[in-house]
Amino acid sequence: MQDDEITENIQPPPQYPGDDTRPTSKKELVGWYSYGWAAEVFTVCAMGSFLPITLEQMARDSGVLLADKTTPCSATWKTPQGTSPTLSADTTGLWSSQAPRTSQCIVHILGAEINTASFAMYTFSVSVFVQAILIISMSGAADHGSYRKILLVACALIGSISTMMFIAVKPNLYILGGLFAVVANTCFGASFVLLNSFLPLLVRHHPSLLAKHRQAGASPNGDRPPATHRAHRTEDEVNVTTPLLPSGSTNTDGATQESVSDTSLELKLSTKISSNGIGIGYIAAVILQIICIVVVVNTNQTTFSLRLVLFLIGLWWFIFTFPAALWLRPRPGPPLRYADGGKERRSWLGYIAYAWKSLGRTAMRTRHLKDILLFLASWFLLSDGIATVSGTAVLFAKTQLDMEPAALGMINVIAMMAGVFGAFSWSYVSRVLNLRASQTIIACIILFELVPIYGLLGFIPAIKRLGFIGLQQPWEMYPLSFVYGLVMGGLSSYCRSFFGELIPPGYEAAFYALYAITDKGSSIFGPAIVGAITDRYGEIRPAFGFLAILILLPLPLMLLVDVDRGKRDAQALSAELEGTRDEPVADGSLE
């Protein structure tokens, strides 16, 4: 009872009908963490390991050799020991030592010859495009009304079921498998944008921050009149946004602007929650990845083994979504008002129209948000480097170091374990060294730069004669994968929370959509350039030079980001957008 009274005392008054200003509860935080535990396995275990292999193998089982365009690819693969040679291609061994790994296979799609490896890449490209469309279209509904949680749960259920459906897809229906992959990856990306949009709200309503504002004698929602005075104001006059971070210039106690060297309490809390979420997701991914490796090995490493693993990944995602669905509060945003009275049949059309018009308007106005532009440009290059280094390293290990699939699986496990360690340890390091969030990100970039530089050492004649160092031996991939995972753990948590500090308050979903689109869209370019370099020189090692440049480019951009200026600009833009945010929706569109 005493805790309830304390909670009631620090709860700020609502700013619009349906506003949930209850302090963030421990159960709500557990619900937020549980979705990271549920869904992170998809991006690590499925997208990072088994989904591309499954798509390529299913297409291969239905394809023909490129050499003669008549011999089925499945005929060139040996069945595992103890199986009948009359079994279908669905039980073909994937990594038999007798299999001609260099033989290229093609499938015919709409009359075009498509390489089976390209089929997986095209599938992911389509999913990224569809994902971007969905993320933009739903951002209006996520920012307004009570749809944020509904959309999150819907995307989670559709994505997890689509992943589980691989268990029923036969190799001759590989296009259907590609469709399931598009749906699953699209829903995963959309759900994580929605999950990220909850983070500033959880921080803003956290009891420790509400208590701090109360002790300071200020409203947690900014400098607002008391509720008794606001009761007679019209809804249009109420500022419905509650900033994640205060402006930092002054407060009711006349405190001076926070020191540049100090990290705000809000950002510390946001970083802590974000880091915990990333770490919990990585722990889940490590556990399930090990389970998946055991399943594949003990089921003779067939195409069915991979489909079974994808079913397990989808089942994990599905089951652990329910705690989030039960415990995560909707936290509705201010409703959109319709000029014609708000007919329900027009509401979703209005939300979609609002989202696209808002995106265009916001994209035009972000030119005034210098620090968000600098950060997004840096993140565009950095996320491209992250995705490209991962794929390039695996391809390098397979083609030039002749590492077996089991060894490649261990590389992924080591990277994930290092990611867990990094997600939890970077906050400690930054606290001990008194680093701001931007400085921690810069430290991660510098450490990340060591990965391609180490690969370039193999060009130095003196080192080349040693026979090791510079990625000349398979064992060198393991410590390098630890460095990669350590960097990913820091970048994943700090970039997300740091970007949240620069977002205009009240527009979290829309700006996190830009964050996600920047993240996903950038990964098209790096792999293509690495492929061109590999075709030009006949080996992958020269591509490490390109990767070194790609990772280094974000560094000067990140150094230019000024968080205090960014917060002031975000507050100003939020005030400007507030005038258009209350425009009524007429005939499903915004005027």
UniProtKB/Swiss-Prot annotation:
Protein location: Vacuole membrane
GO biological process, one term: autophagy
Record's GO cellular component terms: vacuolar membrane
Region Disordered, annotated ranges: 1-23, 214-259
Sugar-modified residues: N239, N300
Biased composition (Polar residues): 239-259
InterPro entries (alphabetical): Atg22, Atg22-like, ATG22/LtaA_families, MFS_trans_sf
Broad class of the protein's primary localization: membrane
Bilayer topology term: Multi-pass membrane protein
Pfam families attached to this UniProt entry: ATG22
Segments traversing the membrane: 35-55, 116-136, 149-169, 175-195, 277-297, 308-328, 372-392, 406-426, 441-461, 478-500, 512-534, 543-563
Superkingdom as given in the UniProt entry: Eukaryota
Keywords: Amino-acid transport, Autophagy, Glycoprotein, Membrane, Transmembrane, Transmembrane helix, Transport, Vacuole
Family, per entry: Belongs to the ATG22 family.
Function: Vacuolar effluxer which mediate the efflux of amino acids resulting from autophagic degradation. The release of autophagic amino acids allows the maintenance of protein synthesis and viability during nitrogen starvation.
Protein name according to UniProt: Autophagy-related protein 22-2
Annotated organism of origin: Aspergillus terreus (strain NIH 2624 / FGSC A1156)
